[in-house]
Amino acid sequence: MATVLDSKVPSGPLGEKWEKHKFESKLVNPANRRKFSVIVVGTGLAGASAAASLGDMGYKVKAFCFQDSPRRAHSIAAQGGINAAKNYRNDGDSVHRLFYDTIKGGDYRAREANVHRLAEVSVNIIDQCVAQGVPFAREYGGLLDNRSFGGAQVSRTFYARGQTGQQLLLGAYSALSRQIHLNNVEMHTRTEMLDLVVVDGRARGIITRNLVTGAVERHSADAVLLCTGGYGNVFFLSTNAQGCNVTATWRAHRRGAFFANPCYTQIHPTCIPVHGEDQSKLTLMSESLRNDGRVWVPKAKGDKRRAEDIPEAERDYFLERKYPAFGNLVPRDIASRNAKEVCDEGRGVGEGQAVYLDFAASIARVGENVIRDRYGNLFDMYAKITAENPYKTPMQIYPAVHYTMGGLWVDYNLQSTIPGLFVLGEANFSDHGANRLGASALMQGLADGYFVAPYTIGNYLGGTKLDPVTANAPEFGAVENDVNERVNKLLSIKGNKTPLAFHKELGKIMWNECGMARSKDGLESALKRIPELREEFWNNIKVTGEAGEFNQQLERAGRVADFLEFGELFAKDALVREESCGGHFRVEHQTEEGEAKRDDDNFAHVAAYEWTGKSGAQTRNVEQLIFENVKLTQRSYK
Amino acid sequence: MATLNGTSNGHGKMLSLTLQIWRQKNSKTKGRMEEYKIKGVSTEMSFLEMLDMLNEQLIKEGKDPVAFDHDCREGICGMCGAMVNGYAHGPDEATTLCQTHMRSFSDGDTITIEPWRAKAFPVIKDLAVDRTSFERIIQSGGYISVGTGGTPDANAIPIPKEAADRAMDAAQCIGCGACVAACPNASAMLFTSAKISHLANLPQGQVERHLRAANMIRAMDELGFGNCTNHGECEAVCPKEIKMENIALMNREYFGAMM
Ligand SMILES: Cc1cc2nc3c(=O)[nH]c(=O)nc-3n(C[C@H](O)[C@H](O)[C@H](O)COP(=O)(O)OP(=O)(O)OC[C@H]3O[C@@H](n4cnc5c(N)ncnc54)[C@H](O)[C@@H]3O)c2cc1C
Ligand code: SF4
Ligand code: FES
């Protein structure tokens, strides 16, 4: 039986819902907040901002991350910028326009009320960050500067050189550090959450492993927040940091939290191509480069001449040719798919899986110095990795997995289907539909952490009668046993294949069958091969070392084990969603020109999967998406 | 990836190397250098990918793989780092270890790899060290004391572009610890001064500037970091090119606090 999902969206006009909801929310008076404890797992943008805000309000907060400092979360790597509807440019931006762009960019697969709230609080984020000392780029008059990003006709992106994520995270980290100093937050670094503890149907704690000593520990609380980021590493190669994983959300899923839209993945068009079998990660080259770079491949198949030897007439600027209105600035999903297409035709450059991003025309027009001023740090990074000079030869780029729109299902309060379990940032599914616009993930993480969760958690704690629970409760013992058993099992198999080898194999299946173009046959084959690989994993994994020590092999093995279950759900979701939308492209569902074809009659909904005790046997529940404020149209960029 | 099955390692050259690596089981045991031979290292690989390859080889031989910290592998998280042939983060200027590529080495080279060495950074295992002391320095005052909400409009206080740029230059520190590892006194001056300078260059940071400097410098001393005697090694190895002039600024802020 499918469960009815209640999104708990407040009634009333779109623009008044959040104010009304805040007013109607239960409050916890300041003196009582000390009595409530909150666990925050993950201290990237979402988690650090939430932990700092909750600590500042007076709750007793315990925060966790697996790196040696909150400052190292994957958020640190974001380059381009953060959106906000400040309209400082006076170019017609507004909360409504940011809302509209985000809904449309997401190909009409996100919840209106959440997205509108995101646009509303976006303006407060910039104020908050400036007050913390985030050194955003400024103009000579001393006011904040903006740049443009894909999918928008206004200039609303705030940035700090090519390191916006770093500066925003350091801002949140400084606020968190202050709360740690004030003893409002107890920080546990190098600690990984391995399971969730549910008592009487409510999330009441977690089981962790201390990554230095190996000690498995219990932590109880009145509410648990998961801010553990995205699952792009299920593909093995991605632009994500090495440690990004699905473990926290997957374990919560197995304890009752629904997993929404797992197949929605963003494949970013401009990344440095794969160089070999031993490669461990892919590096993003910011979207902003497409402002001045022209994308092309040779017209002829197998043309092995150097770029500079191929005359103009023999080059195919395929994005400009196919999408004259948007040219090189079409949205990410479209740019990626077209690059794949020309490479599949045998017209790829370099090792075959790459297209050129050529700055020659721009350099001729505005000069090398201007280009250096705009993109210097990116060109340097490219040169460091490839040993080629992009001022002289065109860059080679290829799409790579970058961001995951799917995640744990949450209602308007960011609460999952387990009461007391809240999910923030990339870990939830909520705001980006089937495709995220550039510079909107940072906005969402900080919106959730600074301005949404502090209210909705107060409402939960103030409005719920919670029995006292300690870590001595039998439920904690039972989950702790599960965790220990699993760890010991991984170590006892002593097979022949390393965690890295399994991870790579899974990644290949995911990339080939669940990547940029998905077909029924391919997905069915993935659904056969992933369980086989999982079976082999549990019989043939080789994990060196012991449980009671710093053991990076054991860490990876645990994460790969969860990816091996998650990958199956991913493929299942992609198979059932018989339409193309945003980053999800089913080859069976395209227009005559080869563009994505949505099916709003049958799929204008969120798919939220419920664990039923066996991997791959989840029930598919549906949250119907209701659009009262935007009209659904086919996206066209021609 | 489709090419994963194709020509392995692109157009790189192959190296055979001898690695001398510091092995230490945990903070309580003594460590020692061990030698390993590795073949088929493509010049296209990053330094950490070379270590991945070594680890796969060690596991196959039934040996304990080398522990080393890393995460982003694109030079921004500050998690990686080791002394390579005596240089923090290896031979390339302004480059983290994860962004160092094997094309900086030659066939037949012997490479020594050791952890950061400093009293305030005890070894956890092999190349991984405990940098909690950096956390404590920031917690002692590396922030502007504002809570969430109730802040003025972001454009209410204009900030001259030059000041914002100077703040950004200092704010780029990734907290890797190379400056401490390279310093003969294991001083944390460059790291600490980068944060102080970032905030002192902004109007929002003015109110607490002297107290901040006093608190952070006190924390630094208490945590066992050494003094600055102007060797300049820190600036030479810093992957983010943080400048020693920040240390001079920090000292001015500190004396301001003493007045
Ligand atoms: C290269 C790159 C560039 C990007 N550029 C932009 C950009 O310009 N603009 C934009 O808007 N977005 C950008 N994004 C996306 C954006 O950076 C991320 O979506 C966002 O930062 C995620 O933040 P988060 O707080 O949700 O998660 P993260 O920052 O990933 O943090 C996750 C946290 O959870 C912890 N954690 C995870 N699992 C566990 C566990 N089991 N136990 C304990 N702790 C755990 C980690 O330690 C970490 O602290 C970019 C992404 C990439 C990869
Ligand atoms: S100052 Fe430089 S070397 Fe020192 S921690 Fe910061 S980035 Fe690393
Ligand atoms: S791994 Fe992040 S800086 Fe090297």
Language-model segments: residues:
Chain B
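Charged, low-complexity intrinsically disordered regulatory segments in eukaryotic signaling
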Residues: 1-20
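Short strand-turn-strand beta-turns centered on an Asx-Gly dipeptide
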Residues: 22, 38-39, 84-86
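Ferredoxin-type iron-sulfur electron-transfer modules in oxidoreductases and energy-metabolism complexes
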Residues: 45-64, 109-259
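Eukaryote-biased recognition of intrinsically disordered, low-complexity regulatory segments
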Residues: 14-36
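Short, contiguous acidic and Ser/Thr-rich linear segments
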Residues: 34-46
